[in-house]
Amino acid sequence: VTSGKWAKGHLNLRGVKESFYHFHAMLQGIGHNLIYWHNHDQPRIVSHYGNDGDYWEKSAKMLLYTLYFMPGTAIVYQGEEIGMTNVDYTELSMFRDVEVFTEYENFTSRGASHEVAMQALRDRARDNARSPFQWDDSAEAGFTSATPWMPVTGNYPRINQAAQAADPDSIFHQYRSVFRQRKTWGIAQGRLTFQDLENNDHFIYTNETDKGVVLVVANFRDYPIDVTLSVDVSPFDVVYSNCETPVAQTMTLAPYDAMVLFQKKE
């Protein structure tokens, strides 16, 4: 499975940034943008752009910081706020989306093995965003006492709303804090400026509002990268961070490091 929407390649971060830049530039001063990572037809964002393995929590927070300090009206797709991942289905019968069955036949008729075809479906199928919400660690993730329309993702004993609510440093509580801060800083009406739009590893931008300037710095890779900031960081305070990397004009970001800095207007 090497082409089309089912192929999983190296993240084209430059293309992602250019898409955001295009819509913000087009609407600046005349309209209002919507910002969101995904919807019911796309893979779970922490599996698609992040890392749902060793860096699950860290990359989920990185994705939170990166998107939701941009101007516009923010939309969170259910499950994103607790770091829900793609499904872990092992059999074709576990899927429900009709597209899956057609594509499976296409894959295998072209020589793909069952496991290769299944991995492509686990990576990209629309059902990834349609599995039952994971409320707690009880049967069927607390979603229902009946049999759900499709299987619950197997990591629900670890990734669920109850566990997230009980942990003050969880992804869920970070979402709540960030959205309160969006309101306080007037993020929705800000002016967006990217640094190094062509860079394919880091995501750096400022958002200037009536309250001050927000600076977001994020590493989208599972390896360290070096960044040199074009904005003088000395007047900024660190407000959010998922890492221990000290802020500096030039710094090495560890995998999925992200930080949000703020300079208050006097």
Walk through the language-model features, giving the residues of each:
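Active-site and adjacent substrate-binding regions of carbohydrate-active enzymes
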Residues: V1-E266
